[in-house]
């Protein structure tokens, strides 16, 4: 809820004596029901790193939710191969032994990403929380390169709604972190509200569109979009934010959600 989101923000700005703590968050395992990480309020926070999962072949795990808010992917199960990790000792654990070799889900991918970030902090304890995100953007690998979800954004980075900026690369991330020069101070800008009384076409491929004018020239790290739409079946709606360069962020993708309205829902895109 709101208190948790406020705690994320405080952790980013006040943690580690002002450098900020890094919070990773699992993108979710709901792909089989057409779920999307942008519909998770905590994965949608710009103060968290949303992590999705890929198989050992670098392909999307069958359960891994996509989203415009996904920053990186990390390896997990999904193709018959699980993750080996420690377990509670004895019979009280997940298995009767002290290890398991079938850990998985984005709940496995996310701690793997956290471990990489810990190595980055060990290599350079002066990194800010934004530095960590920026380094991951620069060093993550373009896995599954033939997948059609990949696009090049206005900053020249390859990015995908399935994989974010790609599979996390521990060696590359630590190497870049070692001599990293911290980013300039963050600039926050708020625009709106933008109010438009639009009729939404039903049952066809046409779109309702309206332009948003932003006067500042900014180097954008992330965007939060608060959406308020009255609609009897929100699962019918696709919501896309398109940049002047043509980069499309699919904030909401139609699925079987039969609830009504988006009531001041905050979407995030990286």
Mark where each language-model region is.
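C-terminal subdomain of the subtilisin-like protease fold in secreted/lumenal serine endopeptidases
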Residues: 1, 20-21, 47-48, 62, ...
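Mature extracellular/periplasmic domains of secretome proteins
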Residues: 1-25, 32-52, 57-77, 128, ...
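Predominant activation on well-ordered alpha-helical scaffold segments within soluble catalytic domains
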Residues: 5, 9, 110, 114-118, ...
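Short loop/turn segments at connectors of secondary-structure elements within structured domains
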Residues: 17-19, 79, 126, 219-221, ...
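Acidic, glycine-rich active-site loops and adjacent beta-strand->loop/helix elements
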Residues: 27-30, 138-142, 255-257
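Residue-level detector of functionally special positions within alpha-helical transmembrane segments
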Residues: 28, 105-107, 164, 169
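Extracellular S/T/G-rich loop segment that most often corresponds to the catalytic His/Ser-adjacent loop
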Residues: 40-122, 126
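Loop and turn regions of beta-sandwich accessory domains that flank beta-strands and are enriched
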Residues: 177-270
